[in-house]
């Protein structure tokens, strides 16, 4: 129990004086006004005051309010005690935190007291305090606490605010008895509680918008350390744990520094949000960064704030792991009962945890890397012993240069990379305990580095770690079913370490200004040569780093069925070996950026680009496919499929005479057969809409055949947007007879193909009705999602050089807001521009849409027409 009263010197006396029990009666309105003034004062003094004083100041102020109202409601005349519990009990009260109180009573509460308690609590709500309260006798307190560890934890931090001291004195000693909670049971319960919380708050969503309290490495992890030790040692503060040798002084100061930073973030967040909020939503991040003194110019302040945040939660996570394990090994378990086996003269295995046999072992830095090589070599090792963690943390701080400077460390590091299990537990522990930063100073530069956007879910070091883990997963046969092509490639590669090192370095140039891929390529080459890789392998790693974005950009923004696109891509890639490495690196990179954004559509695009390029290599890049031969082949295969379905061949050939040749180049034989069968069986006076039940490239294909009208594309886009579907690809072809063939590939709001047959049938009819309207209906004003409102993406219009002489390629980059594609299509419509294809890509909050267009006369746009279109897009969209 926290027995001492909270006090703080910085609270202006006039606030406390007005709340003195002897002062005048205060109404609800009086207290609300006083609270408002106090909060204004808190905000004004935030930047120059110690956060501990600010938290105590609010607890002191709330104490004064409660004492005043306690007397105004005459509760001081009864045998009842007002006790602060939880964070309020510790004297740590943020601006909008819940005020948790216990009203401790005698066994029986009579009607008069019940009414006074009710009016007291009601007034607390009226003055806008977020009150969490319980009314219990001592017996009821103990009964609930024994059942629920959260109640027990709250009582451990209780502090009397007002009322009868006798009741408090009766309860306090009972909380120290083993019948309440033994150290061991309490420890196990808190560990389970933490494990469940970590599971709940993992993932991209809680990395982009972290919960300062509940996230792994957050405030709750610091509190868990304190609670466990408090239960065992009866300590009231982290500082007391140093006296018990549970914490070392440097660990205490590290925890204190981490706690102070997280507290300051949470304190500022409460003011910015105007409510009790622990999740650092995008809406608040810029304002919190400004309030904390990071500045307010662009994205940099948020990125600086978050970089420090991610470094701090990594430190807290490490300390939490080490200290809880230390508690279990030194206090809960009996060391003499441990199962110990000798590994070598320097290391041993203690209950499956690697431990040093000599406390001075890490005086030789090479031993740190050797330990991780042993972890890779010994499959029975499950982790690092807390004693060894302590030694390693201290040795890490003593390093005056990177471990990379030692030749033996370089040899062992490459042995870890090359070992079949090296990128399993060994890499995970090297990342978790900052050994990668100790080894490679360049890695330290990216540790915790965030980009203020919705696309990159992880800090650069965490993303790079995930990419390496993805690449390693491809080498393991038990994961073959997840990514069969990647697994097949990686398991045949003679030197997978080339691929792994590309994963290490692909983003290491970020944050330095300039092209991060080129900067990283230089770093990678230097690293590889210093680690005795051959010149060929070193150049391969450097090439992969420099071109690591090439395949994703080509697959998502270009027509990968266009032989010119494949030829250009193939010329850069050079050969099948480079293609194999690049494909696997690209899949691992895209999956490791934000798992919620990876989908079958992207997977299929990459795979199709891979096979198209592989085919081009095997036929020879210098030998382009003969167009007439390709058309003839597609027609023959489509006709064979149609004949199987007994479709009249003459009707099909008559239809084909209406099509231009690009139709037979841009669709597969299967698509041609399905589309043409439906067209010849359909009444041409009405639009034909087909929504394929079979996923196409991981999406759903929406096919339209209708009389050509200027607004067909714009009308379809606006319709699909209202159905909350995202468009990823579009092809538009006109026939010689005044009809248009439009194909869209769409995904639902979960990034999945449409599954509901009823829904697709209903939607087909609704789209037919929409296409039969003379004019496009006015769209309702789209609402921007909550998390998008703080982002600004300046509109950029770029014209891209392509081979086709009668086409123009335009790239439009803008904020990915609802209705953007509809707006763009409307501008094209009004500018009398024909759309032939569209590749729609989103990178978090940024839309990057590429269109192939032409004039009404089927020509490429002139320079003057390009300038006019760019201006019009800027005026309408920006």
From Swiss-Prot:
Q: Where is the HD domain?
A: 460-582
Could you tell me which PANTHER family the record lists for this protein? BIFUNCTIONAL URIDYLYLTRANSFERASE/URIDYLYL-REMOVING ENZYME, BIFUNCTIONAL URIDYLYLTRANSFERASE_URIDYLYL-REMOVING ENZYME
Sequence similarity: Belongs to the GlnD family.
Q: What is known of its domains?
A: Has four distinct domains: an N-terminal nucleotidyltransferase (NT) domain responsible for UTase activity, a central HD domain that encodes UR activity, and two C-terminal ACT domains that seem to have a role in glutamine sensing.
Any single Pfam family the record assigns to this protein: GlnD_UR_UTase
Q: Which residues form the signal peptide?
A: none
Region (Uridylyltransferase), start-end ranges: 1-342
Q: Which PROSITE patterns match?
A: ACT, HD
Location of the region described as Uridylyl-removing in the Swiss-Prot/TrEMBL record: 343-700
Please summarize the record's notes on activators and inhibitors of this protein. Uridylyltransferase (UTase) activity is inhibited by glutamine, while glutamine activates uridylyl-removing (UR) activity.
Which gene is transcribed and translated to give this protein?
Answer: glnD
- Catalyses which reaction? [protein-PII]-L-tyrosine + UTP = [protein-PII]-uridylyl-L-tyrosine + diphosphate; [protein-PII]-uridylyl-L-tyrosine + H2O = [protein-PII]-L-tyrosine + UMP + H(+)
Q: Which domain of life is it from?
A: Bacteria
Q: Name one GO biological process term.
A: regulation of nitrogen utilization
Looking at the record, the residues that make up the ACT domain are 701-779, 809-878
Q: What is the protein name given in its UniProt record?
A: Bifunctional uridylyltransferase/uridylyl-removing enzyme
Q: Which GO terms describe its molecular function?
A: [protein-PII] uridylyltransferase activity; phosphoric diester hydrolase activity
Q: Which UniProt keywords apply?
A: Hydrolase, Magnesium, Multifunctional enzyme, Nucleotidyltransferase, Repeat, Transferase
């Amino acid at each position: 129990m926290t027995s001492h009263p909270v006090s703080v010197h910085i609270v202006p006396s006039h606030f406390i004086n007005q709340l003195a029990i002897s002062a005048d009666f205060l109404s609800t309105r009086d207290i609300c006004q006083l609270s408002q003034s106090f909060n204004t004062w808190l905000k004004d003094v935030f930047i120059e005051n110690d956060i501990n004083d600010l938290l105590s100041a609010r607890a002191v102020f709330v104490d004064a309010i409660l004492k005043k109202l306690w007397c105004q409601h005459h509760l001081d005349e009864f045998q009842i005690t007002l006790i602060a519990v939880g964070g309020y009990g510790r004297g740590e009260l943020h601006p909008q935190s819940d005020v948790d109180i216990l009203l401790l009573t005698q066994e029986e509460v009579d009607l008069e007291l019940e009414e006074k308690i009710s009016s007291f609590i009601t007034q607390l709500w009226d003055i806008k305090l977020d009150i969490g309260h319980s009314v219990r006798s001592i017996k009821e307190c103990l009964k609930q606490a024994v059942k629920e560890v959260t109640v027990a934890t709250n009582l451990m931090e209780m502090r009397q605010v007002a009322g009868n001291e006798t009741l408090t004195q009766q309860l306090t000693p009972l909380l120290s008895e083993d019948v309440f909670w033994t150290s061991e049971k309490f420890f196990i319960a808190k560990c389970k509680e933490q494990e469940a919380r970590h599971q709940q708050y993992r993932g991209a969503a809680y990395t982009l918008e972290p919960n300062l309290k509940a996230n792994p490495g957050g405030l709750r992890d610091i509190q868990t350390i304190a609670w466990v030790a408090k239960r065992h040692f009866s300590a009231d503060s982290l500082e007391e744990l140093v006296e018990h040798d549970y914490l070392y002084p440097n660990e205490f100061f590290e925890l204190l520094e981490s706690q102070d930073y997280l507290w300051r973030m949470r304190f500022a967040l409460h003011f910015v949000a105007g409510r009790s909020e622990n999740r650092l939503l995008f809406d608040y991040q810029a304002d919190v960064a400004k309030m904390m003194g990071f500045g307010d110019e662009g994205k940099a302040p948020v990125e600086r704030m978050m970089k420090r945040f991610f470094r701090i939660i990594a430190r807290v996570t490490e300390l939490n792991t080490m200290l809880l394990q230390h508690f279990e090994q030194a206090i809960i378990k009996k060391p003499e009962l441990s199962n110990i086996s000798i590994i070598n003269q320097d290391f041993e295995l203690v209950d499956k945890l690697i431990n040093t046999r000599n406390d001075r072992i890490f005086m030789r830095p090479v031993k740190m890397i050797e330990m991780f090589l042993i972890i890779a070599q010994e499959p029975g090792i499950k982790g690092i012993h807390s004693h060894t963690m302590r030694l390693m943390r201290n040795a890490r701080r003593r390093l005056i240069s990177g471990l990379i400077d030692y030749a033996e460390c370089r040899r062992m590091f490459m042995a870890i990379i090359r070992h079949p299990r090296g990128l399993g537990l060994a890499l995970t522990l090297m990342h978790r305990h900052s050994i990668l930063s100790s080894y490679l100073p360049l890695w330290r530069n990216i540790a915790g580095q965030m980009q203020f956007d919705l696309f990159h879910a992880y800090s650069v070091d965490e993303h790079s770690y995930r990419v390496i883990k993805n690449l390693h997963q491809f080498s393991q046969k038990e994961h073959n079913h997840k990514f069969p092509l990647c697994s097949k490639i990686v398991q045949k590669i003679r030197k997978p370490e080339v691929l792994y090192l590309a994963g290490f370095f692909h983003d290491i140039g970020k944050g330095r200004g300039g092209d991060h891929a080129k900067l990283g390529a230089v770093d990678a080459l230097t690293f590889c040569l210093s680690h005795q890789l051959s010149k060929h392998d070193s150049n391969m790693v450097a090439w992969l780093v420099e071109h690591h974005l090439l395949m994703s950009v080509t697959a998502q923004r270009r027509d990968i069925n266009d032989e010119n696109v494949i030829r250009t891509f193939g010329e850069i890639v050079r050969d099948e070996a480079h293609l194999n490495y690049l494909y696997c690196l690209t899949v691992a990179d895209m999956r490791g950026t934000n798992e919620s954004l990876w989908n079958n559509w992207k997977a299929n695009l990459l795979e199709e680009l891979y096979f198209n390029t592989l085919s081009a290599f095997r036929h020879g890049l210098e030998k382009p496919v003969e167009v007439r031969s390709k058309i003839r082949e597609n027609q023959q295969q489509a006709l064979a499929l149609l004949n199987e379905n007994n479709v009249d061949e003459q009707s099909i050939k008559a239809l084909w005479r209406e099509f231009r040749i690009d139709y037979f180049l841009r669709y597969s034989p299967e698509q041609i057969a399905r589309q043409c069968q439906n067209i010849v069986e359909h009444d041409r006076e009405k639009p034909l809409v087909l929504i394929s039940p079979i996923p196409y490239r991981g999406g759903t294909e929406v096919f339209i055949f209708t009389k050509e009208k200027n607004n067909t594309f714009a009308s379809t886009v606006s319709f699909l947007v209202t159905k909350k579907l995202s468009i990823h690809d579009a092809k538009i072809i006109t026939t010689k007879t005044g009809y248009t063939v439009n194909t869209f590939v769409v995904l639902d709001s979960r990034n999945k193909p449409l599954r509901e047959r009823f829904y697709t049938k209903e939607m087909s009819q609704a789209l037919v009705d929409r296409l039969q309207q003379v004019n496009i209906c006015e769209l309702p004003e789209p609402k921007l999602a909550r998390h998008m409102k703080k982002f600004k993406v300046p509109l950029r219009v770029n014209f891209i050089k392509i081979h086709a002489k009668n086409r123009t390629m335009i790239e439009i980059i803008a904020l990915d807001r609802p209705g953007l594609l509809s707006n763009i299509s409307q501008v094209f419509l009004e500018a009398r521009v024909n759309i032939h294809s569209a590749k729609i890509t989103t990178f978090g909050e940024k839309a990057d849409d590429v269109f192939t267009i032409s004039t009404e006369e089927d020509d490429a746009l002139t320079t003057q027409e390009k300038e006019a279109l760019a201006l019009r897009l800027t005026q309408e969209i920006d």
